[in-house]
Each structure stands twice: as C-alpha cells, then as structure tokens.
C-alpha cells in the first residue's frame, strides 16, 4: 500500500439541510454505513470536483434541497485507490469499487469488499482517494479520521457563518 501526504487540497460537498449545521460531522455516514465505512464508523465523503459533488448528492433520489460547501483538507495521509497496483495491495478488484454495497450489506448481510479494505487502511492512513460510483471519471476523498491531535485537518469556507447550528 502506498500512502502519500496531501499538504493542501480543495473539495466540495452538498449537505442535506438536516446536517448543514454540522458540516464536519461524519455521523450521517456512520448512521447506516457507506461504501467506504461500516455502520458506526464516521466518515467524511468529499468529492474532488463540483460535478461529482452534485452526482454523489443526488444518487438514486434525484434533485433535492442542499447546501453547497467548499472544504480545504491539509496534512492528510491518503491512499490512492484509483491506482490499480494500490487497489490490489489492499485486496480490491476494480469491480469492487462500484459494486452495489447496499444490497450486499443490507439484503445479503455480507461485508462489502470496500469495508474490508477500509479496515486495513484505517491503521496507516487518514483516508483514501476513490473513484466515484455516481459520476464516471469523478473522484472522492473519504476520510476516516480528521481534526484530531495530528493528521488530516479539514475546514470549510463559510465567511458569513451561514452554517451555524
């Protein structure tokens, strides 16, 4: 596995109105789990570009209200799962990246391969760069740790304090 340090990068996210007052929370992802996190494991999913942010937010639900937010991530140790050799080193196949994780976990009661890979990555990284399953050619940064004593730092741009709870 090849983890690299990201010094500073910009990301985007659309927040549900329900979570707009907590833009740094990973509790929405922890509630039911996500493609790259088990239920109970907080995660922050940050699309790398605006188009991917919209596609990820809509997914199978279509257009719905949301708050568009710009994020800055710095000092993060990241594993790039867009790289085939890195994927193989954590036991993932290309098909695992877009496999239908919800039916695998919720209907079949099995562990998605992405959860097992994330378990292995947690010890050595703050997160991973992953291809978007919602937007072909798009990427997301998934963080499992942020704003702790050391490691990844995440902030968001809110000059007018619009996201205050």
Where are these regions (language model features)?
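Extended catalytic/binding region for NAD+/ADP-ribose chemistry, centered on the ART fold
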Residues: 34-61
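Active-site and NAD+-binding cores of ADP-ribose-processing enzymes
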Residues: 1-31, 35-38, 60-165
